């Protein structure tokens, strides 16, 4: 009889302990900031960021998903100014969101780089001008990372720059900036997903023609890479 009571006691104690651990897990607060163009094309059914939300929202300790601070045609310097000025959308302040977020994706750099390359022909005569411009974008991103790190102590993933100019001659510039950014993120303990290489693996990941967009297949490929990183960097540490 005493043994039965002991077994029942241990059983319910175990249930209470498991419930306590689950209820005291840190909330998963997921945010993406930066450029909206990467995932706003009307040719896709669901973008990679929303696919991540779909998976994270199934967790008992899911908190929030913020994509308020993604914009069309935003530059890195604009993002820096937004943080400095603590801009708000419907009384949601960017500094507060960054402080509360523990899974953060940053997407910036594509707008200004692709705009520059669309205005300047890719040839040896223009190489210096283009590389100098890439270095300036890099400096802005470095400042942005410093601002974000001052506010955020969570896991951060930076999305690399991909070639949406439709011109393969520009690949050398994307390889150059991605290598610099990869080293920068590594030195700041930020994970890096190089979209240039991810999207170049399959011709179905990008549309054809002058206006290049990421397809459904491309978004799923990015989602798979990102969610695996989120699982490795954050989710499994909560077990």
Predicted regions: what they are:
Residues 15-16, 51, 221, 225:
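Short amphipathic alpha-helical face segments that pack within enzyme cores
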Residues 18-26:
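Sec-dependent signal peptide cleavage junction
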Residues 88-239:
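Alpha-helical cap/lid subdomain in secreted, periplasmic
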Residues 1-5:
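Positively charged n-region of N-terminal signal peptides that target proteins for export
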Residues 25-27, 154-155:
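Short hydrophobic/aromatic-rich motifs at helix boundaries and adjacent loops
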Residues 28-31, 37-124, 128-139:
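Conserved SGNH/GDSL esterase-like catalytic core that processes O-acyl groups on lipids
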Residues 6-19:
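Hydrophobic membrane-insertion alpha-helices, especially the h-region
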């Amino acid at each position: 009889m005493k043994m039965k009571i002991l077994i029942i006691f241990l059983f319910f104690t175990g249930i209470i302990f498991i419930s306590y651990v689950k209820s005291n897990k840190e909330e998963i607060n997921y945010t993406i900031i930066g450029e909206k163009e990467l995932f706003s094309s009307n040719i896709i059914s669901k973008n990679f960021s929303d696919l991540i939300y779909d998976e994270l929202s199934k967790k008992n300790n899911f908190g929030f998903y913020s994509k308020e601070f993604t914009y069309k045609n935003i530059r890195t310097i604009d993002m820096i100014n937004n943080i400095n000025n603590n801009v708000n959308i419907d009384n949601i302040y960017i500094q507060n969101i960054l402080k509360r977020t523990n899974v953060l994706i940053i997407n910036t750099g594509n707008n200004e780089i692709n705009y520059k390359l669309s205005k300047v022909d890719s040839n040896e005569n223009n190489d210096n001008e283009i590389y100098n411009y890439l270095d300036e974008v890099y400096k802005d991103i470095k400042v942005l990372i410093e601002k974000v790190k001052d506010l955020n102590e969570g896991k951060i993933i930076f999305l690399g720059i991909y070639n949406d100019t439709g011109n393969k001659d520009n690949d050398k510039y994307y390889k150059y900036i991605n290598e610099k950014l990869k080293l920068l993120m590594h030195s700041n303990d930020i994970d890096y997903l190089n979209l240039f290489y991810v999207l170049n693996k399959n011709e179905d990941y990008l549309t054809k023609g002058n206006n290049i967009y990421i397809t459904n297949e491309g978004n799923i490929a990015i989602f798979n890479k990102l969610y695996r990183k989120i699982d490795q960097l954050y989710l499994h540490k909560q077990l």
